[in-house]
Regions:
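Divalent metal-cofactor coordination and adjacent catalytic microenvironments
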Residues: 1-87
């Protein structure tokens, strides 16, 4: 998985300017953690655009909900489930 591409997409989803690198190391760890978690539940990510967007969406959701309890949105939960079934 292209980490720099994922980082750029995560920053875009969070409306952070591309030149703002203050949180890049943190976002990279978040992306790595999200990929590892997906792998633990049986999703083996490929280089496809669909897998990249699943990783980005999952990372952004985790980041935005890190301090509050809440269920995963249905669209993301179903996307993750469908990808898991495809493996």
């Amino acid at each position: 998985m292209d980490m720099e591409m994922a980082l750029g997409l995560v920053k875009a989803r969070l409306n952070r300017p591309p030149g703002d690198t203050a949180l890049d190391a943190y976002f990279k760890k978040r992306i790595e953690g999200a990929a590892a978690k997906l792998k633990r539940i049986g999703i083996h990510l490929t280089e496809s655009a669909d897998d990249m967007m699943l990783l980005v969406d999952y990372t952004v959701w985790q980041y935005q909900n890190r301090d509050k309890a809440g269920d995963m949105p249905d669209w993301l939960r179903l996307d993750r489930r469908e990808r898991w079934l495809a493996d």
